[in-house]
Amino acid sequence: MAGHPKEKVIPDEVHQNQILRELYLKELRTQKLYTQYHVNPLRKIHTVTRKPMSWHDNLEEPADARFLNLIHHAAQGPRKKYPETQTENQEVGWDLEPLINPERHDRRLNHFRVCSDITLYKAKTWGLGDDHHK
């Protein structure tokens, strides 16, 4: 019962034509024609050195201002390129201003090293080493 072979239905030409038409329309939807090519400025490229004795490579070519601007823009850091952070990791260290005013004379936040007689004595004994002070 489980192995009953089903009769194979032979599709007619209209059905075959409809399948081919759907495939053709799907290909046309996904195709994209590229007419303008340029180098990706975000990817590092290897320069190809020219042959020093060839005459056609030694001709001076005008500099492409648009391409140079793209290269210079890609070489900048993210803080110079964008006004705001683009990723979560850029948020760390984006703002360089301190959150509070660093007043050096405020004793609540600045705990400087205070030296007294006991601390000076202990610092000198630690400076001599363990073998001298035994």
Curated annotation (Swiss-Prot):
Gene Ontology terms describing biological process = flagellated sperm motility
Write down any Gene Ontology CC term.
sperm flagellum
Q: What is its main location?
A: cytoplasm
Q: Where is this region: Disordered?
A: 76-95
- Which UniProt key words apply to this protein? Cell projection, Cilium, Cytoplasm, Cytoskeleton, Flagellum
Coiled coil ranges = none
Q: Which domain of life is it from?
A: Eukaryota
Q: Where in the cell is it found?
A: Cytoplasm, Cytoskeleton, Cilium axoneme; Cytoplasm, Cytoskeleton, Flagellum axoneme
Q: What does this protein do?
A: Microtubule inner protein (MIP) part of the dynein-decorated doublet microtubules (DMTs) in cilia axoneme, which is required for motile cilia beating.
On subunit structure and binding partners, the annotation says: Microtubule inner protein component of sperm flagellar doublet microtubules.
Q: What family classification does the UniProt entry report for this protein?
A: Belongs to the CFAP144 family.
Q: What is this protein called?
A: Cilia- and flagella-associated protein 144
Identify the taxonomic lineage of the organism of origin.
Eukaryota, Metazoa, Chordata, Craniata, Vertebrata
Q: What gene is this protein translated from?
A: CFAP144
